């Protein structure tokens, strides 16, 4: 044993320090004294003999000499086995090799790489460690499981690299692959595409890429995982849900229903999720639609938290809503005001129907303009000629001309818009060479066949339509349709609240239609009459909740409703306003009775009134008077207070959700109402947008996908996209009120420290930067007016805060600015100290 250890140490002696050698000598000395054996056969052994000279007893014993060789062979592997816990041994195999040095044979342990065609090997004794093995796996095979590596990324907007650590995780990589299939709508068999597989293998040869069947299974598992997360999230939502429902027919001629829920979360951000996208069999009767919708709500356990349902104006939907309300009332779902606010008709669909009725009056002229567009776009050569004329008229050639779609009135508007834009080019094209113009268009174009005579009619039509004087009414028509188009776009948004915009927008449309009825052009008057009939039909049955949403807009309140009521109803407007106020109070009373945190304010009546009530023997009447007294008092403290305050003066874009978020403490019940009412969707665009994705998922090449996997793909994409947006998108709604002072402080610290300012007068000279900071902060005055009541006070506080920051950062004497620091409110001082501590 002594010879084997000493010789092995001599072979590797150049790797060790002399102190380690002394420790080993001491260890050998103790072993020699305890086992009473030992021989010296090499020069280093003679040194050990000299050291052991005071103890000569171990040398004269020859009997243990034949045993040292087998003992290390048995004990050494046992000691090494305890240390073979590293994961590198999954890719290396230990082998013992016998080597001869100076005529003596020794055993060395080497680790051989297990990868094919790799002949790398490294010494595997315990004192060599595993660093060499890991370096080989990382550099030659890109495989070091669990090891942190460095990745380099470009910082956005800067020419610098950001180096961040990352750790390879096979499970995470597989999840990313299946998320890519879902989010980008790749086919399942992409995992079997030859070059895709080669690409993945080039990045990581042992990546476990599987078949399309396995990919489908993983996607279903991911869908169930995300579904469970969403279920838990919806369970914790405190507000009510508004829903949208719509139908769609795929290329398989299968009908799909999409149900989307909308709510305002605790951060007052509007959220939406698709909770159902499934195949509906059989006839689309109202009863079947109601049963399907109710089953979805029960499945997600939100049937008792519904506020409204937005639908198209179909007869089956009318029956479905009636049945849904009855079903929910039977299940004790506690609908708001017994479902009076539940049914919301799609505003965009109403505008579509009204505009189509108006366009039907001038269908002949629309067809002529449509024929002109077809004639121009009938051949590439004709289109090139038009683009040359457009260049000569300094028009944008990339704009193009849209084509009319019979089911979408807005496509008619876009066609008119583009035709009017290219009007100078069309006139130039017509006058350039009429005969050549006719010959170029003698071809078949989609649904139209143009002969020479027919083209003469088309050219004549162009002369009429494009004639400057006679074409003015087309410009008027375009302006009329633009009002419909702009309002449709405004009400189609899903990332912001649209409920408060409906009433004002529809009142403006009604006012315009009334004006068009008296227009000097006969065509416009005919259109206006047709539009007015359809508009009045839906105006009478519009949901009162959308007027409530307008009332909850601090820019309008009850004043806007009174304005339009007086305009439309004349002297009888007060009756309609009083009816609306009664609806508001009824809604307020409902939320007051349901709110556990409703304020219970003491009555303002005199003591004699209380004594009379206490002595009253009619308990029911007494309780009623108490309830009435408390109810009236709460109203006077909150609802009437809101109505009595002046309108908010605000120009530009207004974030109504942020405004109400800052009033939770001031209006606890009204904020609950606003949180539910402002989540109403006035259009079904949110559900219709899912059908565009459905058309790509269930395309002609994948029309055999089952309804279950279709729902998994559509829903998972929607859920992941929403959660991903929540990770990186930070809006003003998500910034707490108290953090604005900290934000201003940090910006001022940047001006003070980073830009090299060392004393207060320098900072006073940089007031332009300070003004820009304040202007950026006051863009959302709905938050800022809670902290800073006007601009100049904010500016004064910011300058004082700047002085305060300069003193702290540069160690100036504090007493000269003591009075300035005293002006700062405590809600600014505390974040200032915290921010400076972190800084």
UniProtKB/Swiss-Prot annotation:
Record-level GO BP terms: DNA recombination; transposition
Keyword DNA repair applies: no
Location of the region described as Disordered in the Swiss-Prot/TrEMBL record: 32-85
UniProt xrefs under InterPro entries: hAT-like_transposase_RNase-H, HATC_C_dom, RNaseH-like_sf, ZnF_BED_domain_contain
SMART domains, A to Z: ZnF_BED
Pfam entry (one): Dimer_Tnp_hAT
Biased composition (Pro residues): 55-70
Entry protein name: Putative AC9 transposase
Misc. comment: This protein is coded by the transposable maize controlling element 'activator' (Ac), which is able to activate chromosome breakage at a specific location; it may be the structural gene for a trans-acting function required for transposition.
Organism: Zea mays
Keywords: DNA recombination, DNA-binding, Transposable element, Transposition
Start-end of Polar residues biased regions: 32-43
MF GO annotations: DNA binding; protein dimerization activity
């Amino acid at each position: 044993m002594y010879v084997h250890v000493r010789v092995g140490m001599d072979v590797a002696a150049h790797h060790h320090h002399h102190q380690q050698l002394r420790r080993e000598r001491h260890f050998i000395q103790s072993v020699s004294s305890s086992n009473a054996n030992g021989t010296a056969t090499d020069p280093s052994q003679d040194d050990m003999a000299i050291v052991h000279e005071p103890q000569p007893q171990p040398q004269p014993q020859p009997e243990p000499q034949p045993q040292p060789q087998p003992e290390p062979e048995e004990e050494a592997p046992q000691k090494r086995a305890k240390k073979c816990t590293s994961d590198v041994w999954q890719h290396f195999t230990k082998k013992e090799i016998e080597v001869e040095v100076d005529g003596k044979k020794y055993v060395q342990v080497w680790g051989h790489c297990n990868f094919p065609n790799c002949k790398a090997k490294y010494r595997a004794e315990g004192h060599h460690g595993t660093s060499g093995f890991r370096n080989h796996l990382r550099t030659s095979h890109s495989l070091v499981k669990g090891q942190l590596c460095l990745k380099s990324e470009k910082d956005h907007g800067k020419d610098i690299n950001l180096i961040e650590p990352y750790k390879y995780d096979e499970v995470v990589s597989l999840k990313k692959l299946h998320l890519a299939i879902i989010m980008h709508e790749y086919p399942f068999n992409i995992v079997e595409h030859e070059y895709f597989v080669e690409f993945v293998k080039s990045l990581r040869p042992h990546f476990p890429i599987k078949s399309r069947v396995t990919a489908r299974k993983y996607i279903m598992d991911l869908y169930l995982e995300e579904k469970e997360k969403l279920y838990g999230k919806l369970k914790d939502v405190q507000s009510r849900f508004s829903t949208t429902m719509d139908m769609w027919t795929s290329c398989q001629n299968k009908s799909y229903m999409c149900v989307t829920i909308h709510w305002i979360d605790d951060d007052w951000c509007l959220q939406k999720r698709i909770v159902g996208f499934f195949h509906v069999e059989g006839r689309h009767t109202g009863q079947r639609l109601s049963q399907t919708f109710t089953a979805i709500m029960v499945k997600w356990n939100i049937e008792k938290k519904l506020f409204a349902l937005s639908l198209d104006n179909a007869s089956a939907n009318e029956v479905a809503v009636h049945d849904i309300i009855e079903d929910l009332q039977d299940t004790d779902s506690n609908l708001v005001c017994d479902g009076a606010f539940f049914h919301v008709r799609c505003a965009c669909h109403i505008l579509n129907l009204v505009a189509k009725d108006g366009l039907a009056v001038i269908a002949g002229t629309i067809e002529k303009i449509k024929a002109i567009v077809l004639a121009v776009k009938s051949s590439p050569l004709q289109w090139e000629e038009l683009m040359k004329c457009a260049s000569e008229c300094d028009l944008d050639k990339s704009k193009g001309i849209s084509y009319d779609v019979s089911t979408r009135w807005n496509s008619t508007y876009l066609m008119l818009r583009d035709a009017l834009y290219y009007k100078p080019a069309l006139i130039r094209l017509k006058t350039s060479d009429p005969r050549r113009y006719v010959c170029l268009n003698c071809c078949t174009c989609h649904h139209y066949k143009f002969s020479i005579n027919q083209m003469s009619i088309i050219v004549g039509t162009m002369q009429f339509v494009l004639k400057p004087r006679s074409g003015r009414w087309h410009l008027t028509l375009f302006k009329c349709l633009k009002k419909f188009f702009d309002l449709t776009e405004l009400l189609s948004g899903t990332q912001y609240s649209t409920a408060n915009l409906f009433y004002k927008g529809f009142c403006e449309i009604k006012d315009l239609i009334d004006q068009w009825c008296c227009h000097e052009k006969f065509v416009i008057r005919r259109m206006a009459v047709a539009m007015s009939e359809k508009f009045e039909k839906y105006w009478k049955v519009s949901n009162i909740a959308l007027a409530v949403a307008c009332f909850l807009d601090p820019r309008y309140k009850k004043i806007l409703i009174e304005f339009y009521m007086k305009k439309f109803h004349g002297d009888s407007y007060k009756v309609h306003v009083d009816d609306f106020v009664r609806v508001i109070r009824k809604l307020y009373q409902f939320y007051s009775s349901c709110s556990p945190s409703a304020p219970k304010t003491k009555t303002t009546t005199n003591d004699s009134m209380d004594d009379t009530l206490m002595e009253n023997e009619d308990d029911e009447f007494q309780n009623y008077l108490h309830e009435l007294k408390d109810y009236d008092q709460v109203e006077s403290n909150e609802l009437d207070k809101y109505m009595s305050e002046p309108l908010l003066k605000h120009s530009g874009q207004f974030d109504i959700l942020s405004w109400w978020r800052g009033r939770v403490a001031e209006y606890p019940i009204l904020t609950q109402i606003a949180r539910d009412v402002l989540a109403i969707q006035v259009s079904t665009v949110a559900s219709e947008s899912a059908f565009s994705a459905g058309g790509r998922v269930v395309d002609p090449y994948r029309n055999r996908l089952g309804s279950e996997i279709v729902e998994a793909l559509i829903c998972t994409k929607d859920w992941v996209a929403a959660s991903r947006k929540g990770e990186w998108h930070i809006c003003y709604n998500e910034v707490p009120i108290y953090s604005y002072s900290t934000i201003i402080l940090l910006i001022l610290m940047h001006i003070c420290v980073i830009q090299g300012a060392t004393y207060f007068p320098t900072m006073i000279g940089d007031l332009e930067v300070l003004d820009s900071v304040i202007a950026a902060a006051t863009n959302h005055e709905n938050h800022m007016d809670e902290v800073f009541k006007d601009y100049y006070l904010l500016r004064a506080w910011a300058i004082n805060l700047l002085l305060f920051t300069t003193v702290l950062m540069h160690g100036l004497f504090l007493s000269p600015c003591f009075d300035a620091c005293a002006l700062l409110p405590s809600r600014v001082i505390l974040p200032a100290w915290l921010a400076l501590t972190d800084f």
